[in-house]
UniProtKB/Swiss-Prot annotation:
UniProt-listed GO biological process terms: thiamine biosynthetic process; thiamine diphosphate biosynthetic process
Reactions that this protein is recorded to catalyse: 5-(2-hydroxyethyl)-4-methylthiazole + ATP = 4-methyl-5-(2-phosphooxyethyl)-thiazole + ADP + H(+)
Cofactor: Mg(2+)
Top-level enzyme category: transferase
Protein name per UniProt: Hydroxyethylthiazole kinase
An MF annotation (GO) of this entry: hydroxyethylthiazole kinase activity
UniProt cross-references to InterPro entries, sorted A to Z: Hyethyz_kinase (IPR000417), Ribokinase-like (IPR029056)
Annotated substrate binding sites: M50, G198
Pathway: Cofactor biosynthesis; thiamine diphosphate biosynthesis; 4-methyl-5-(2-phosphoethyl)-thiazole from 5-(2-hydroxyethyl)-4-methylthiazole: step 1/1
Organism domain of life: Bacteria
NCBIfam families: PRK09355.1, thiM
Free-text function comment from the UniProt entry: Catalyzes the phosphorylation of the hydroxyl group of 4-methyl-5-beta-hydroxyethylthiazole (THZ).
Amino acid sequence: MQPDLHCRTLAAHTLKHFRALSPLTHCMTNDVVQTFTANTLLALGASPAMVIDPVEARPFAAIANALLINVGTLTASRADAMRAAVESAYDAKTPWTLDPVAVGALEFRRRFCLDLLSLRPAAIRGNASEILALSGMALGGRGVDTTEAALAALPAAQALARQIDCIVVVTGEIDYVTNGQRTLSIPGGDPLMTRIVGTGCALSAVVAASCALPGAALDNVASACCWMKLAGQVAAERSEGPGSFIPAFLDALYHLDMEAANATN
């Protein structure tokens, strides 16, 4: 099954709908990336909410447009709050996205993520090692870093998407987005995106928010990946290193409506 190249014209069209909806996105993410994730969503036009307390997480997940579960700094108490939020989202039919950070390296989070899969995520976003581990095809990875190329994990992603009936995103130099039947590829980005903390986690939040949009989920999620790749390219051209890349990246996301509309395939 050969991946199709995602159309940037469609990504520009999807971004207009995204900004109009401004999805209220409940982010239960890791401590390292909270601010960057919130700023990424705001720059694109979404409305982030970083609600983590168990007492609040359950009711808030039911009223949000989308929910992100990121296990990067997982603890036992946080796992309880996340499970409560996912159960609430499932009951309310709120789409939720799983970011299984380092799932192949640590047993507690692996068991937790596998347990959550029964509650039907709308999307899963991870690097190649994480997707291979979550699918049961391999364990390992070097913490949050991948030891595999994205293309190597594509069969696992396609099988996982069919098994769970969701969208699976494998990120790398080229991102692959699949529903198990159809696969889209999104090239672009820049190596500087791997030299700062949080671009992958922020992408997971944007993927989660995109799942709140009407229409084809595969195209919406692929568009989210395209926005981030394009912003990374633009930011790299305007920055001198990681320190200046971050504000340039947020600016590129903020102005992306014009840049995406003018981009060619």
